[in-house]
Amino acid sequence: RAEGIGVICRELEKENPALPVILTGDFNAKAGASAPYTRALEAGFRDAWVEAPEKKGPPVTWSAFAAPKEGEDSRIDWVLFRGNVSAKSCETVLYNEDGRYPTDHFPVLAGLTLAP
């Protein structure tokens, strides 16, 4: 996974490195101290969940089709950005119908602003 994010970062550097980039997805690694997360930060990416002043929902994105447990912290789905982008809000969407979740991941919704 760390090599995968490394490939993405190297390919992005071939383009105009001054352009803003938004990178999202299921990285199958916890945000924080995992190698892919560290590699992304070293490449200049910032994490919308960390940067956003307004947060909603728990810091959990993998659900195993169940509600998150109190105090759980397992963000493996990230919204990363770099360049002239800022995070205004970030939310883990806990949508379910009668306790049935449509997927084993909670969607992440980020409010981002692109500066001129």
Language-model region placement:
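Active-site regions of metal-assisted phosphoester/phosphodiester hydrolases
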Residues: 1-116
